[in-house]
From Swiss-Prot:
Cellular component, GO, one term: dendritic spine
Phylogenetic classification of the source organism: Eukaryota, Metazoa, Chordata, Craniata, Vertebrata
Protein name in UniProt: Leucine zipper putative tumor suppressor 3
Residues the record lists as Phosphoserine modifications: 343, 345
Similarity section: Belongs to the LZTS3 family.
Main location: other
Biased composition (Gly residues): 322-333
Ranges annotated as biased composition (Low complexity): 248-265, 301-321
Length: 700
């Protein structure tokens, strides 16, 4: 069983007292037995109902005992006086006398301070979680450790479980709280206006004794058993500052109202505080002086509930307890070992008085709480409504802000999603472009490799073509030189042909003149022959003289022959020969008659034949000249055609070389190759002679 589920035990007085506890009582004394009743902790029940007085003991309420309202809305708040322990004056020093009626008497209703002094509150002994009650063992007046529950087995405490582990025999017969707070939808916290105040003096004395285990049964007879029962009832109180204790009655504010506590020990907080030092009364008698023993208990005179600020009341109460202790011993000034403990009847009477005072206090507290319950409920309801309104406003504002934040987050998320989609698309596009560029680079690398191979193949071919071009250029220059020589020869031949043509014209003209002379000579010969025939017929032969001799004819002709050409000379010689033959013929004719005429005719025929042969020779020579001219023209046409073809092939080769060089430069620039390319100026300078040659060849 957990400590929170333990049953709290409250004190109860029953009459008559048990004879086996205290034995015979003197006449006039009413013995009382202290019994603890279990009270179950219930959040729906008022914890203060456990200390409600019996109906027979309740008297008319004292106006001074009414408590002021706790809430700020209730007026006429006043403090109620509390009766401290041991302040009764009735009875004097008689230890067996009882006080008068509890509702009257000046000793029972003394004025007390309105606040609980924190230095006078007694801390109850704490309860061990897994063991017996603390304070179950104590020391007697002789300094010996005595168990409060040991010795006697008549009560059967040795075989019983500790009280904190016992199940309650019957639930407490208490009424529920007022129904004013039951209308709330949620359970409200029952406030309590009092807190336990811990005194300093008795707390320091209480801690002098270390916690010890309870090894003896709790039903032992005598004072030790009584003090053990008191210790058990006292150890059920909360240990310093629990939420279920009672606060100062003067602090009438809602801030001093603690919440419910789940422990069961809060019901006995006022009683345990007032009875916590009873077990030390017998041991404190040795410290009193020889003057009646009143001053011996002055240092231990603490108030039961922390409100005994009057030193005289405490001294009188403790002095009476000391007197009871000294009466048993017979001498208050005896040593501590010789002192006898106080009588049980005095202790019971003192406990009964204190219990009655506590009941009165509880009743006053109950009445004050009932009076202030409406105000507290109203304040709590107002505060609850205000809190609900604030909570609704906060919820509305927070919901609006959350919606705004959600919308912003949604828009931001949508924007981020769009950006992510765009980035993914850009990434895919860039990847495709990168793949395409990689493929293009690979293709270009392959093309560059092929171009490099072609270039490696073209270089020797280009060298060969260059050598061939140089060789062809040399051949062309040689052919041009030969052409120039042939052109010079042809021009010389042409000039000779022109001279020959002029000579032929001159020969033809001279030949016509000779023919004309020959015709004139023939006419003159015929006329002379006719005249001769006439003269011959008239004159005698002896009288006839010879004509001009051939020598006379040849002499004037030799002077002219030096100025004539070969053909003219030939013609002149032929003419001279013909003239000579004519002279001879004439001579023969003259000499011989008709025979000379026939010879002349034969000579003329021969000369005509020679002339025809000469004409045929000239015709053959003209035909040979024409053939030579034709052959020369054909050769010239062939040379020009060859030059044209050579120039065309050279131009085509040049263009092909330029195209190859341009392709090599383009591929070198694309592939990043550093192949040196010839400059344009060098190409122009290298091919300038071919251009001049082409011009010269076209001018021919």
């Amino acid at each position: 069983m957990a400590p929170a589920d333990l049953a709290s035990e409250g004190p109860k007085l029953e009459d008559p007292p048990a004879p086996h506890l205290f034995g015979k009582c003197p006449s006039g004394l009413i013995m009382a037995k202290l019994e603890t009743l279990p009270v179950r902790a219930d959040p729906g029940r008022d914890p203060l109902l456990a200390f409600a007085p019996r109906p027979s003991e309740l008297g008319p309420p004292d106006p001074r005992l009414t408590m002021g309202s706790v809430g700020s809305g209730v007026t006429h708040a006043q403090e109620f006086p509390m009766k401290s322990v041991g302040t009764r004056t009735g009875g004097g020093g008689n230890q067996g006398s009882f006080p008068g009626p509890r509702s009257g008497g000046s000793g029972a209703n003394r004025e007390r301070p309105g606040r609980y002094p924190s230095e006078d509150k007694v801390l109850a002994n704490s309860l061990y979680l897994n063991g017996e009650l603390r304070g179950s063992d104590h020391t007697d007046v002789c300094g010996n450790v005595v168990g409060s529950s040991g010795g006697s087995s008549s009560s059967g405490g040795s075989d019983k479980a500790p009280p904190q582990y016992r199940e309650p025999n019957h639930p407490p017969k208490l009424l529920t709280t007022s129904g004013k707070l039951d209308q709330c939808s949620e359970p409200l916290v029952r406030p309590s206006a009092f807190k336990p105040v811990v005194p300093k003096n008795f707390h320091s004395m209480q801690n002098l004794c270390p916690p010890q285990t309870n090894g003896t049964p709790e039903g032992r007879q005598g004072p030790a058993g009584l003090k053990g029962g008191l210790d058990k009832s006292r150890t059920m109180t909360p240990a310093g500052g629990s939420g279920g204790g009672l606060s100062d009655s003067g602090r009438n504010s809602l801030t001093s109202l603690p919440t419910y506590s789940s422990s069961y020990s809060q019901h006995l907080a006022p009683l345990s505080a007032s009875t916590s030092h009873i077990n030390r009364i017998g041991t404190a008698g040795y410290s009193s002086g020889s003057s009646g023993g009143g001053s011996g208990y002055q240092d231990l005179g603490t108030s039961d509930s922390g409100r005994a600020s009057s030193k005289s009341g405490s001294s009188s109460s403790m002095g009476r307890s000391g007197h009871l202790g000294s009466g048993e011993g017979g001498n208050g000034g005896l040593p501590f070992a010789a002192c006898s403990p106080p009588s049980p009847s005095a202790l019971i009477q003192e406990l009964e008085e204190r219990l009655w005072e506590k009941e009165q206090e509880v009743a006053a507290l109950r009445r004050s709480l009932e009076q202030s319950e409406a105000a507290v409920a109203q304040v709590l309801e107002e505060r609850q409504k205000a809190w609900e309104r604030e909570l609704a406003e906060l919820r509305q504002g927070c919901s609006g802000k959350l919606q705004q934040v959600a919308r912003r987050a949604q828009r931001a998320q949508q924007g981020l999603q769009l950006q992510v989609l765009r980035l993914q698309q850009d990434k895919k596009q860039l990847q495709e472009e990168a793949a395409q560029l990689i493929r293009q680079r690979e293709e270009l690398e392959d093309k560059v490799a092929v171009c490099q191979k072609e270039q490696a193949d073209f270089l020797p071919r280009m060298e060969e073509t260059k050598w061939e071009v140089c060789q062809k250029a040399g051949e062309i220059s040689l052919l041009k030189q030969q052409l120039k020589d042939s052109q010079a020869d042809v021009s010389q031949k042409l000039s000779e042909i022109v001279g020959l043509r002029s000579q032929l014209r001159e020969g033809r003209a001279s030949l016509r003149e000779k023919e004309e002379q020959l015709l004139s000579l023939r006419d003159s010969f015929g006329s002379k022959q006719a005249s001769l025939e006439l003269s011959e017929g008239e004159l005698p032969p002896a009288c006839l003289k010879p004509a001009l001799t051939p020598v006379d004819l040849v002499e004037p002709q030799e002077a002219l022959a030096s100025c004539e050409s070969d053909e003219a000379k030939m013609r002149r010689q032929a003419g001279v020969a013909a003239a000579a033959s004519l002279v001879s013929v004439d001579g023969e004719v003259e000499a011989g008659g008709e025979g000379g005429t026939r010879a002349l005719r034969r000579e003329v025929g021969r000369l005509q034949a020679e002339l025809a042969a000469e004409r045929r020779a000239r015709e053959r020579q003209g035909a040979s000249f024409a053939e030579e001219r034709r052959v020369w023209l054909e050769e010239k046409e062939k040379v020009i055609e060859y030059q044209k073809q050579l120039q065309l092939s050279y131009v085509e080769m040049y263009q092909r070389n330029q195209q190859l060089e341009r392709r090599l430069r383009e591929r070198g620039a694309a592939g990043g190759s550093s192949t040196p390319t010839p400059q344009h100026g060098e190409e122009k300078k290298a091919w300038t002679p071919s251009r001049l040659e082409r011009i010269e060849s076209t001018e021919i």
